[in-house]
């Protein structure tokens, strides 16, 4: 069998290519044609992050010519494969690949190409308090690059996980503790600090506010002439705005510090969306925010969206 295959492969007879020789029945132009879910190693140059990541790529071109039966997917694959050569992803590099994809399909009258990359950016994160303690945190990233004629557009989407504590629940918890304290000490004209401390040690957490793991999915436009993608800067800005990003390695002192951060950053889902949007305004073009609180009080989630307010348009 192997000898037969070798003889066949060594023949010079051209192989048929029906995408060139056969006409498309009922020919119509197609908006996009290509591939999804291609495994690809890519390099990402972000401070404090692992450089090499495993990405999944989607790539397509338009097919305006109604008579052309199909595109040349192997051409797209080979051009996409060049992104795995170890060179760090950049706006210029992505734009170059898209131009090459369009050029490779001139026989299809192709004028547009698009590329989507999905990967986890692995960042080293220090503990809040403990010196020398750190761990790795993965941030899901999506890069969308589109070339339409001479117009190049690039967007980045990142997902940041954080903790949210409900302000209403916190107020109700404080009210319960307040009433319990008055019931215990309201009849006393003078209360010893030691007695108060002892009571608080036992009863201060008799009612606790509900909190939950939450996520912010943020998309921004990236400049075509940027030297890098600037992903970790975007992530840091989001985490700083929220104030309670989830931690990696912790000791008791770090867990206590995290509890203090949660207490100082009580927020509804509306608060979180507004915080992030305000932090991005003026720093990133066309920011769009979607936040989700995976409620511990309810079996459903609380969600909110935020987008830039257009001049002359109502805020809501």
Curated annotation (Swiss-Prot):
Keywords: Hydrolase. The record marks 166 as: May be catalytically important. Its EC number is 3.5.4.16. The keyword Hydrolase applies. InterPro entries: GTP_cyclohydrolase_FolE2, GTP_cyclohydrolase_FolE2/MptA. Pfam families: GCHY-1 (PF02649). PANTHER family: GTP CYCLOHYDROLASE MPTA (PTHR36445:SF1). This is GTP cyclohydrolase FolE2 1. The lineage of its organism: Bacteria, Pseudomonadati, Pseudomonadota, Betaproteobacteria, Burkholderiales.
């Amino acid at each position: 069998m192997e000898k037969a295959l070798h003889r066949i492969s060594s023949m010079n007879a051209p192989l048929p290519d029906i995408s060139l020789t056969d006409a498309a029945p009922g020919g119509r132009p197609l908006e996009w044609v290509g591939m999804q879910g291609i495994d690809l190693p890519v390099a990402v140059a972000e401070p404090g992050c692992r450089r090499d990541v495993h990405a999944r790529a989607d790539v397509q071109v338009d097919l305006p010519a109604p008579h052309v039966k199909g595109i040349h997917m192997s051409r797209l694959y080979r051009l996409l494969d060049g992104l795995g050569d170890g060179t760090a992803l950049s706006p210029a590099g992505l734009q170059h690949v898209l131009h090459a994809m369009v050029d490779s399909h001139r026989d299809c009258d192709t004028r547009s190409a698009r590329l989507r990359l999905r990967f986890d950016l692995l960042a080293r994160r220090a503990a809040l308090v403990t010196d020398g303690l750190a761990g790795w945190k993965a941030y899901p990233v999506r890069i969308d690059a589109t070339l339409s004629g001479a117009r190049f557009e690039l967007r980045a989407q990142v997902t940041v996980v954080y903790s949210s504590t409900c302000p209403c629940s916190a107020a109700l918890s404080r009210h319960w503790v307040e009433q319990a304290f008055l019931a215990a000490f309201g009849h006393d004209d003078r209360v010893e600090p030691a007695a108060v401390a002892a009571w608080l040690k036992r009863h201060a957490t008799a009612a606790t506010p509900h909190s939950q793991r939450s996520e912010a999915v943020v998309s921004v436009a990236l400049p075509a002439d940027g030297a890098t993608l600037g992903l970790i800067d975007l992530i840091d800005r989001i985490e700083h705005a929220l104030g309670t990003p989830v931690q990696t390695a912790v000791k008791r002192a770090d867990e206590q510090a995290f509890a203090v951060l949660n207490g100082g950053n009580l927020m509804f889902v509306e608060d979180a969306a507004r915080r992030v949007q305000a932090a991005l305004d003026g720093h990133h073009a066309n920011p769009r925010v979607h936040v989700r609180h995976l409620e511990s009080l309810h079996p459903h989630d609380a969600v909110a969206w935020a987008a830039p307010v257009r001049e002359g348009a109502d805020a809501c």
